[in-house]
Amino acid sequence: MTNMIDPHLLLSAYATGIFPMSDSRETDEVYWVEPKKRGILPPDHFHLSRSLAKIIRSDRFLVTADRDFEAVIDLCAEPTEDRPDSWINPPIRAAYCQLHNLGYAHSIECWLDNRLVGGLYGVNLGYAFFGESMFSRVSNASKVALAWLVARLKVGNFSLLDCQFITDHLASMGAIEITREDYLKRLKSAVSSYFTDKETGNWNTLDRLSPLLHNKHSKTKENQFADADLPFTEGIALETDGTAPGEASFSLACPNGARIVQLLGQIS
């Protein structure tokens, strides 16, 4: 048990298939978990339903990356009707916020009417992304966030999306359950080159892709961004490529929903 998590220890734990949890958001105690069965979602086997594809193409949500990591983790930790407590306690929150500041933890945000209504966060190490938690305050927001995450991982050459535990929700979108032995083989393949040559998947590749401009039902990200009065826009001096100095890339011409559907491939 410990109430402090060193970021280097946390990354080393991920590299060996272990991650932290707690029994309650009200405690400072943390324990380490190594499941006998592991949930993963192979990026090339994401199940995109026709209904979800339609929602994504409509660009109902403005989807961003790394724009409000702390808000995402706080909303993931909030109790809900289905989940009255959370394992995201103060030491775990602090550890992942520190990883985010170091460039290892990332978030996906879904905005609707200027409100953060869905999202997820996780850890990037090598060619692996370890999904930690997601939330949704309106229907389909977390599904849209996951779809955008998978598209980002595909174009960034990631090979492993770790879901930790399988759920019916994740299984419906392509997640599978594998043995610990199988998982460790995949994990080694995904992270070993990081420790030898610092090779890693490219989190920002997606932001450099242009939207499908022929989609008449979609607003471009440039127009969405200009029209939106979002918390992260205040005080941000955008450079010519749409990147805020010192922050993760967010191009004004990054993909719209039509391009995300195209990147995800076959609709099931």
Curated annotation (Swiss-Prot):
Reactions accelerated catalytically: N-terminal L-lysyl-[protein] + L-leucyl-tRNA(Leu) = N-terminal L-leucyl-L-lysyl-[protein] + tRNA(Leu) + H(+); N-terminal L-arginyl-[protein] + L-leucyl-tRNA(Leu) = N-terminal L-leucyl-L-arginyl-[protein] + tRNA(Leu) + H(+); L-phenylalanyl-tRNA(Phe) + an N-terminal L-alpha-aminoacyl-[protein] = an N-terminal L-phenylalanyl-L-alpha-aminoacyl-[protein] + tRNA(Phe)
Assigned GO CC terms: cytoplasm
GO biological process per UniProt: protein catabolic process
Job description of the protein: Functions in the N-end rule pathway of protein degradation where it conjugates Leu, Phe and, less efficiently, Met from aminoacyl-tRNAs to the N-termini of proteins containing an N-terminal arginine or lysine.
Keywords noted in UniProt: Acyltransferase, Cytoplasm, Transferase
Family to which the UniProt record says this protein belongs: Belongs to the L/F-transferase family.
Primary location: cytoplasm
Subcellular location: Cytoplasm
Molecular-function annotations in GO: leucyl-tRNA--protein transferase activity
Known EC number: 2.3.2.6
Name assigned to this protein: Leucyl/phenylalanyl-tRNA--protein transferase
Xref: Pfam families: Leu_Phe_trans
PANTHER family: LEUCYL/PHENYLALANYL-TRNA--PROTEIN TRANSFERASE, LEUCYL_PHENYLALANYL-TRNA--PROTEIN TRANSFERASE
